[in-house]
Amino acid sequence: MESNRMINRILVATDASAASNRALEMAAQLSTQYDAELLIIHVIRDMQIPFDIKEIPELESDTIESFATAREEIMRKVAESVLRDARAKAGKAGASKVETTIGTGDPATSILDVAKRRETDMIVIGTRGLGKLKGQILGSVSRKVTNNAETSCLIVR
């Protein structure tokens, strides 16, 4: 069923930072205003174990593998918790059609892929998240998303 509304599906990225929480609040308000679906994404960054660490004789490959598996499990549980909280906040703000998804890898690439695959009409993102360069006006993820998105973007301060 095709809708005549301009905004039918909104994607908002969250990392539980203050900026992403403000973006979530704005996206939830827009979702309510436009009766649009709200898709919330949290991205787990790929953090490969450096190849040269595998060359250290004291570290057995089983130990390295166990560490990688434990890290992945912890990051997935963190993502699930972040998304559970985000869904609750969106609901409190009035959003009724809310979905969550976990992305992996480079955050900007993952956000852009989901936006394209899910045919979102708008991406809402905070100015900067939990990255290292706090003094920047736009974070690297926000910049990459807005520069490469095929849809409208709203950057929330």
Model regions: which residues?
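Short secondary-structure boundary segments
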Residues: 42, 127-128, 157
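Structural beta-alpha unit
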Residues: 1-6, 73, 77-123
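Small/aliphatic-rich secondary-structure junction motif
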Residues: 2-64, 93
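Short, flexible loop segments at boundaries between secondary-structure elements
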Residues: 151-156
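Glycine-rich, Arg-bearing micro-motifs that act as flexible, cationic patches
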Residues: 116, 122-147
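Short glycine/proline- and acidic residue-enriched helix-loop micro-motifs
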Residues: 62-74
